[in-house]
Amino acid sequence: PKALSEIVKDMTADQGLIPTFFNEKGTLYFQISDSILGRDLLMVSRYVQIPANFNAYSNAGSKTSEQLVHFVKKGNKIQLIQKSYSNVAEQTDPIYLSVVQNNFDPILASFEIENSEQGYLIEVTDYFMNDSPGFNVVPSRLKTQYKMGGVDKKRSAIDRVASFPINTEITHTLTYSASKAPRGNNAETLSFQVNHSIIELPRDPMPVRYEDKRVGWFSLGKINYSSQALKSDAYRLARRWRLEPSDMEAYKRGELVPPVKPIVYYLDPATPLKWRPYFRKGIEDWNSAFEKAGFKNAIIAKDAPTPEEDPDFSPEDARFSMVRYVASTTRNATGPSVSDPRTGEIIESDIIWYHN
């Protein structure tokens, strides 16, 4: 096999959760280390830019998919496998074997190992030049409605690659033919720019809280096959922020303490200036509720940094919670979030605020 230095010659290297190599021709390599094999990762896909009149509740910032994945070495290949924690059992329980056998995880992609000098080097160009399994860039219903063809690679590209300590970000543009495109589109073409965040889930999973029907939680559904109920036992975990007292002794004395990690919402740079003070006030008004739970300054509103202040900041980055301001005739607002499928811990949230 070729030497690593020869394969990645003249490519831009970026170290982080998954080291990457990328060049101007659009070739992209991942370097998968032994330490990341088998580790739970969350892949979150979002629109960065979408065509006009595509779908009433789809906009820049909308999530197209959220999937738990891990990398597995199989011979001379690295497989990307989708994982699920929906059906569970104690590993020491005999029924655990049946749970595994009846919940076989799908293989999303398989990559040849081209070099193993400093980890397993795999080319992922084709994977990110397609609407690959799990991306769900265009739902099947809309593909049928707009009579869309496959991805035209000549009019598609990988636009941005960035890797950070706990996440790796890939942005690409995918272009499709569409013989029955949305109104106002005479080109019979639809192009989408999509960002994929691959983020490391917490190594110390948050303690779970079970859903209480008396409280309006968003929740995760699971089925426990090790239950004493003598049947498959369905239950739900509350999706919640991980607020932990920075001073536990003071917290136990009933004093207000700041959390170790406050909830931070960034305002979309597209938010009209005249509304921004009220957006910030509306967000931070929730602090009075958190004070009842013993926390002060638990939730903070900030303006998103400018490119000059932080060139790496991206609204689509799954590390950051955003209030997205959307130029749309749609009314009202929505509040989707991304959570750890193991525990329900909210990783980030994007409030979609429509102009109407």
Can you say where each PLM-predicted feature lies in the sequence?
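Auxiliary tRNA-acceptor-end handling modules of aminoacyl-tRNA synthetases
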Residues: 1-271, 289, 293, 298, ...
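Alpha-helix N-cap/helix-initiation motif
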Residues: 272-276
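Solvent-exposed, polar/charged alpha-helical surfaces in well-ordered, non-transmembrane soluble domains
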Residues: 277-284, 288
